[in-house]
């Protein structure tokens, strides 16, 4: 829930890009919950194998960059790497692989869309570019103007991700959906549907949100 609160706080001050990065994290959390609901302990074991391999990889990275350590620390670390060399055989997890064949598989499309804003892509950096001056030199706007439609889209996606988490946790607990949760889902669908109406004449692929 800390992510949700942070998204709201960022939205209130117009930090859309930063909010979208956190919404992306919310979707990733929903993938894990959905997979846990689907595969239970089997997925828990996959998570453990993933963590083992990543720990060894991080350890190997320290040696590759020849970071300076105290002799005793380096000796213990090398021994740890030797004792856990079998951890390299584990499989690593990816968001796309985790969400595959789960109840929220289609939401990976939104995650992929948000991933553009989580990296220094040309799309992301273009937010800060101003038209070129008379000498052909582009300008930089460190505080680009807020785009209300993008902020609304971000909050809409955040609601979608949070609902996925709530229903996933409900499945993990093997509980019946509460009336409050059902009402929230119905309200979201109604708002999302209403938000699409003004954009019926837009080009295919665009989404309207409310």
Question: What residue spans do the PLM features occupy?
Answer:
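A cross-kingdom marker of C-terminal helix-rich interaction/assembly modules
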Residues: 1-210
């Amino acid at each position: 829930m800390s992510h949700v609160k942070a998204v709201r706080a960022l939205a209130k001050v117009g930090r859309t890009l930063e909010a979208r990065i956190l919404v992306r994290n919310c979707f990733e959390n929903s993938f894990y919950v959905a997979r846990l609901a689907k595969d239970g302990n089997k997925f828990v074991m996959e998570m453990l194998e993933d963590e083992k391999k990543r720990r060894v990889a991080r350890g190997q990275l320290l040696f590759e960059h020849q970071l300076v350590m105290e002799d005793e620390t380096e000796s213990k670390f090398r021994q740890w790497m030797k004792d856990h060399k079998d951890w390299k055989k584990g499989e690593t997890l990816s968001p796309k692989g985790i969400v595959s064949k789960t109840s929220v598989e289609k939401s990976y499309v939104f995650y992929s869309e948000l991933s553009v804003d989580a990296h220094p892509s040309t799309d992301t950096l273009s937010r800060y570019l101003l038209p070129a001056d008379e000498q052909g030199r582009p300008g930089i706007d460190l505080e680009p103007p807020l785009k209300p439609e993008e902020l609304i889209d971000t909050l809409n996606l955040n609601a979608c991700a949070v609902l996925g988490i709530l229903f996933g946790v409900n499945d993990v607990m093997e509980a019946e959906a509460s009336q409050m949760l059902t009402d929230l889902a119905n309200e979201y669908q109604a708002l999302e549907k209403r938000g699409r109406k003004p954009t019926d004449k837009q080009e295919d692929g665009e989404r309207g949100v409310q």
